A protein has these predicted regions:
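Juxtamembrane loop-helix boundary motifs flanking transmembrane segments in multi-pass membrane proteins
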Residues: 18, 22-26, 60-71, 147-151, ...
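Short helix-to-coil transition segments within interhelical loops
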Residues: 129-159, 199
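Short, strongly hydrophobic alpha-helical membrane anchors
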Residues: 1-28
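Transmembrane alpha-helices
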Residues: 147-179
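Membrane-water interface segments at the C-terminal ends of transmembrane alpha-helices
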Residues: 27-130, 165-174
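Non-cytoplasmic
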Residues: 95, 166-202
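Hydrophobic alpha-helical elements at and bordering transmembrane segments
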Residues: 26, 30, 34, 76-79, ...
């Protein structure tokens, strides 16, 4: 499939492609970017969903109100969200080496990208879930639903549209972060832009 795409793009762009960058390199960079986005978004969604749900249910008035958990998790999410990605990328190098075995490359970039996008998605998910009408939760409680059933069968389905919109926003943010990661050795489109764009600019 990959060879077919490279061959097809080469034929299409041959008349006007005037660059030392080959189509094969371009497709490889796209593949690396897709890999970083897909896995970081997958792990980030899982982590973000846990954070978002926890923030909603443990806040004051939540169905599992717990001030201790909320007042620890809330500032932690804010702190991680406000941390510039390039600083986070460097700060988690020891953790990346433990988990992946190296701090350079596409797989290594997935660790800081996941840590970066998780709290961001967590806050967006929290916002979406808080938009659900209180009456729906009260109705679920009146029917005898437990907290897990309330979240999974009532709140999340009701917030589905908002969750999809916020997931799109998170994905766009993540793509921007992958370009930044590529500039420091992660590969992908960011690496391509630095190697064949900025460094060769005359």
């Amino acid at each position: 499939m990959r060879d077919f795409i490279v061959q097809w793009l080469t034929q299409i762009t041959a008349p006007f492609w005037q660059s030392s960058l080959s189509i094969d390199q371009f497709v490889t960079a796209l593949q690396e970017t897709f890999q970083m986005v897909f896995f970081s978004l997958l792990f980030g969604c899982i982590w973000g969903l846990i954070q978002g749900i926890t923030l909603v249910v443990t806040r004051t008035g939540g169905i599992l109100q717990n001030r201790a958990i909320y007042y620890v998790l809330n500032p932690l999410v804010n702190a991680l969200r406000s941390l510039p990605f390039i600083i986070l990328l460097i700060a988690v190098i020891p953790l990346t080496k433990i988990l992946v075995g190296t701090s350079i490359g596409t797989w290594a970039a997935i660790v800081p990208l996941t840590i970066y996008v998780g709290p961001y998605l967590g806050r967006l998910i929290e916002t979406s879930l808080l938009e659900v009408n209180e009456g729906i939760i009260e109705s679920a409680q009146a029917m005898g639903a437990n907290p897990w059933q309330i979240i999974v069968k009532f709140v999340i389905p009701e917030a589905r549209s908002s969750l999809i919109l916020n997931l799109t926003t998170g994905t766009i943010t993540l793509i921007g972060a992958t370009a930044m990661a590529g500039a420091v050795g992660a590969g992908g489109i960011g690496d391509l832009a630095i190697s064949y764009g900025y460094q060769r600019f005359d």
